[in-house]
């Protein structure tokens, strides 16, 4: 709540599609969409119908439904990994695959990208200090151990830094987004992702790709779009239409290795899974969302609108010669307070301007638009319209004009 702009948070009354209404009756165009949790649009009809039906048939029984097989097959088709396990969130999915990676490699450490976010996973709240040492990020409260015991941090797009981190021979896994989305959008440079894959193979390190946000590029995320071959893939949020859920996929080789190493009689003490993981309600939501909402046709529309949104922002920035820029990732776009697009998480973090950001968010809110409060990101959903995007472009242009005049 503290991240929202203004003295008081907006309390929501109801939301549908690309809009929501607050308790005072004000209507907003939603470009935040629950920070991707509602990338489907709020309460998509197909997902709501599936939830209603399943709620009457049983919410959870700690046994699989037919939807488990249907959803697994759909995920395999989209992302290219044959086997899937379900969790309650993408955070849990990341926790579980880190544990599996340590089991499979016999190694203790993971590599993460500076200024990454993968949910509330203890090992990921690390950054680099001024001399390149791994330290806890500011605000990381109650860390169970010093972060340099569990983690090595590497800058995004730094292939030499990645090899240096892996060369110690003690890294179980690399956990990364294929494009950074939680410190602003930072895109991979040509050849970077392919080089990371090759380094993971060279040093016997497991590659985990987190597609929770980068699914904005299409039905199979950047994994399908770039032809990536991760060992594990994690995702959550949007695939359930807003119902808490997560999942992780794995290669057949990984699955076979796990089967050989995990003893059935002690599997419930392995730190993997949860009583509500893969419950019937969340699987019904995933099936309906993947089948009827996050479709090729809807992604095609959303990506066109994402381009239109970014073009509108770029036009205003150019017209008023502001030292800003705009990055885009499929259906997602972001204003950046710097003329040069960031190459690393540190670049993106250093381009931040807290007071300007607070003003911009509050101004957009007063003009009837909600954007993601942690930075300046906007996301399109199947219900977003060209008129919504053009209205934002007009409001953004007016704001830029007033800032220049001031």
Question: Model segments located where?
Answer:
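Conserved N-terminal phosphate-binding loop of PLP-dependent enzymes in the Aspartate aminotransferase
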Residues: 1-406
């Amino acid at each position: 709540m503290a991240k929202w702009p203004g003295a008081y948070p907006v309390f929501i009354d109801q939301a549908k599609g690309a809009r929501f209404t607050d308790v005072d009756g004000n209507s907003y165009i939603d470009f935040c969409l629950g920070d991707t949790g509602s990338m489907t649009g709020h309460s998509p009809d197909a997902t709501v119908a599936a939830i209603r039906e399943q709620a009457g048939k049983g919410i959870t029984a700690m046994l699989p439904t037919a939807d488990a097989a249907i959803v697994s097959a759909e995920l395999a088709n989209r992302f290219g990994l044959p086997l899937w396990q379900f969790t309650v969130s993408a955070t849990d999915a990341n926790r579980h695959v880190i544990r599996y990676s340590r089991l499979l490699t016999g190694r203790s450490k993971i590599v993460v990208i500076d200024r990454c976010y993968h949910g509330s996973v203890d090992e990921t709240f690390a950054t680099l200090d001024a001399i390149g040492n791994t330290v806890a990020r500011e605000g990381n409260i109650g860390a169970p151990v010093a972060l340099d015991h569990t983690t090595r941090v590497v800058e995004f797009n730094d292939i030499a830094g990645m090899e240096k981190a892996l060369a110690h021979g003690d890294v179980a896994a690399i956990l990364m987004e294929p494009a950074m989305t939680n410190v602003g959008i930072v895109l991979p440079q040509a050849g970077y992702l392919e080089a990371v894959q090759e380094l993971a193979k060279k040093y016997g390190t497991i590659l985990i790709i987190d597609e929770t946000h980068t699914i904005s590029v299409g039905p199979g995320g950047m994994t399908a779009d770039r032809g990536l071959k991760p060992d594990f893939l994690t995702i959550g949020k949007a695939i359930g239409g807003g119902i808490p859920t997560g999942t992780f996929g794995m290669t057949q080789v990984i699955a076979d290795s796990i089967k050989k190493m995990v003893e059935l009689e002690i599997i419930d003490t392995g730190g993997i899974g949860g009583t509500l993981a893969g419950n019937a309600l969340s699987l019904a939501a995933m099936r309906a969302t993947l089948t009827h909402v996050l479709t090729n046709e809807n992604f095609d529309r959303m990506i066109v609108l994402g381009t239109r949104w970014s073009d509108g922002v770029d036009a205003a920035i150019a017209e008023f010669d502001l030292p800003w820029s705009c990055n885009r990732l499929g259906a997602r776009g972001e204003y950046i307070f710097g003329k040069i697009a960031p190459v690393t998480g540190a670049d993106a973090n250093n381009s931040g301007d807290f007071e300007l950001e607070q003003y911009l968010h509050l101004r957009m809110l007063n003009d009837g638009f909600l954007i993601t409060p942690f930075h300046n990101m906007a996301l399109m959903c199947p219900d977003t319209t060209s008129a919504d995007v053009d209205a934002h472009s007009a409001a953004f242009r007016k704001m830029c004009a007033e800032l220049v005049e001031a």
